[in-house]
Amino acid sequence: RGERRTGPRTRVEIVTAGLLLRRLQADPDLPGVTAVVLDEVHERSLESDLLLALLLDARTLREDLVILAMSATADLDRLPAMLGSTGSTSPTSSGGPSGAAPAPVVSVAGALHPVEEVWAPPPRTSRLGPRGVPREVLAHVAATVRRALAERTGDVLSFLPGAREVDDVVSRLRASLPPDTDVLPLHGRLGASAQDAALAPSPPGRRRVVVATNVAESSLTVPGVRVVVDATLARRPRLDVARGMSGLVTVGASRSEGVQRAGRAGREGPGAVYRCCSPTDWARSPLAPT
């Protein structure tokens, strides 16, 4: 966070959506940039939607600007039309300009091993309370991690909605797991060395539990993980109309987020996902983040 390492020989620069937005506001035609790669475009937010709109405007100023959108769960009906070559400037119902040829779709096949679903809803407790995630739910997530360690082999990756919940579950697990099991947090508030430690492989003879926010949902691969414990919760920006301010609220995760999280367990071999909700809650979840 806050680090920048670029120089005269830089060819590829990795930035956040917010930083690229500020750059577009200062230089709408992105001078010196040949291509922009948007990773995980399915993770929609006000910031990412605005970024995509400004990039499409930039392409009207520079026809040579290449925009590449990547995702394992992208909407292949709307996105190619939106990114298609410019014809007329009037939009169609799919979001792209009328008369435009849709952008080409490149599919990259990846090896994904089967992932078994295990339902582990919290007993007699709602996943969300009036003040966020109840402590009983956090205790249940920690108990589910201990259950997964007893029933499965390999390392465990657990998903919580925010840094506070991550730190709470990490404390519970460190106090209850044997000394040969490392428990590591992973979220955006950590320094680079702590994040690197969470992403490093386990030493021989040791097991590891990584408790993370959605930072590990899709963009990162945590080596050695064969089990995912998903609290099935997420943080969303919401606008408070009465106050005219936006803030983060905790909600149930969407099914597309759940699929992405479960996929972390099937990267290196057959795995399992323990979902801390009931099948009914899962079926009622939105298909994509809203």
Please state what every model-predicted region is.
Residues 1-290:
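P-loop NTPase motor module signature
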